[in-house]
Regions:
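Glycine-rich phosphate/pyrophosphate-handling loop used in enzymes and phosphotransfer proteins
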Residues: 1-247
Length: 247
């Protein structure tokens, strides 16, 4: 809470000198207006995404369109836009939904599916790695990462909502290889080719660990498939948004 107060005071001082616009709808005098901020507290959607090993559960806040798309772009590219609270709230929704998807939720009513053969019976210990998609060295240097803070929020909520015996940790386990280029502005085929062989693993999870990949946007799934390759497999994906109809 103290961090939120400090961020609020800082935004107020900056706003008094330099007018701001809502990152989502461009309304004046708000970094995020109440309507756009509420997108982070809407229910998460559970869908699926194709991977090299078959469909993976995909938990997302919505489509890559409208205010949600503009908020993500501002988080990645605007030095004046602080959407930390938005990422925290959205991550909490995603993490809570993941508990049901993975079959580790503390409440039986929260379960929407489980990973047959992967999740031990109730009472057994379960380890979950929450792995953020890798950022370029430039984005890391500028402090404009989105996947890492989102992954931390996802992990906190997943741990808080999980049954006893479930251990959740954020593992920043994947890096882009030298020479890997940005995916921004690329078409589907270019994205797929651009991500093939572009990553390396700093750590590989043991076979009995559940692995969740977290990214700000999932488009063609090229990043997910490359993370799956270097980590030896994934069990679910969490993202702020994805293109197309949520089903």
């Amino acid at each position: 809470m103290e961090g939120r107060r400090v961020r609020g005071l800082t935004r107020g001082l900056i706003g008094a000198i330099l007018p701001v616009q809502c990152a989502g709808c461009r309304a004046w005098d708000e970094v995020l207006c109440p309507s756009c901020r509420s997108l982070a507290s809407s229910p998460a959607h559970v869908a699926s995404i194709d991977s090299a090993r078959g469909p993976l559960p995909l938990v997302t806040m919505g489509d890559y369109d409208g205010p949600l798309r503009r908020i993500v772009l501002a988080a990645k590219h605007s030095a004046r836009t602080d959407v930390t609270d938005f990422l925290d709230e959205a991550g909490a929704r995603l993490g809570t939904a993941l508990g049901g998807v993975l079959g580790v939720a503390g409440s039986p009513a929260a379960a929407v599916g489980s990973l047959a053969g992967r999740v031990p019976s109730t009472g057994s210990a379960v380890d979950v790695w929450v792995v953020p998609a890798p950022s370029s060295w430039k984005r890391r240097l500028r402090g404009r990462q989105v996947a890492l803070p989102l992954a931390r929020a996802v992990a906190r909520a997943l741990a808080a909502s999980a049954r006893p015996g479930v251990r959740v940790q954020v593992v920043d386990a994947v890096r882009l290889r030298v020479g890997a280029t940005s995916q921004s502005g690329k078409a589907g085929a270019q994205r797929t080719v651009g991500r093939m062989g572009s990553m390396r693993a700093l750590a590989v999870p043991p076979p009995d660990v559940l692995v969740v990949a977290v990214d700000d946007v999932v488009t063609t799934g090229a990043t997910v498939r490359e993370m799956e390759r270097v980590l030896g497999g994934l069990d679910a994906v969490a993202t702020l948004c994805r293109p197309g109809l949520i089903s």
